[in-house]
UniProtKB/Swiss-Prot annotation:
SUPFAM superfamilies: SNARE fusion complex (SSF58038). The lineage of its organism: Eukaryota, Fungi, Dikarya, Ascomycota, Saccharomycotina. There is a cross-link at residue 63 (Glycyl lysine isopeptide (Lys-Gly) (interchain with G-Cter in ubiquitin)). Residues 1-94 are cytoplasmic. The chain crosses the membrane at residues 95-111. This is Synaptobrevin homolog 1. It is a single-pass type IV membrane protein. The keyword Ubl conjugation applies. A lipid is attached at residue 95 (S-palmitoyl cysteine). It comes from Saccharomyces cerevisiae (strain ATCC 204508 / S288c).
Amino acid sequence: MSSSTPFDPYALSEHDEERPQNVQSKSRTAELQAEIDDTVGIMRDNINKVAERGERLTSIEDKADNLAVSAQGFKRGANRVRKAMWYKDLKMKMCLALVIIILLVVIIVPIAVHFSR
């Protein structure tokens, strides 16, 4: 090899051409190294994905907690509204009953007085 060309561990040297078994060994080593590099890359991607998943799960958990708190507040508010509507309905029924009683008294009392003479 001349000093002007950079060193390449996968390039064949003059001595390697004379030994084909050494070439096979180096190509097999290069294949294994490429496979290892691919596996390392995949594992790094998997680790990053797991970390992102953990962050998303934490975010979802926080949102679920907030939703549970909001649901409890909504339930309390709904119960207050239900009780207020029940009370209004009761007052309306009592007023209606009172009006009916007054109308009956206004109608029945003059008739009773008229027939009692």
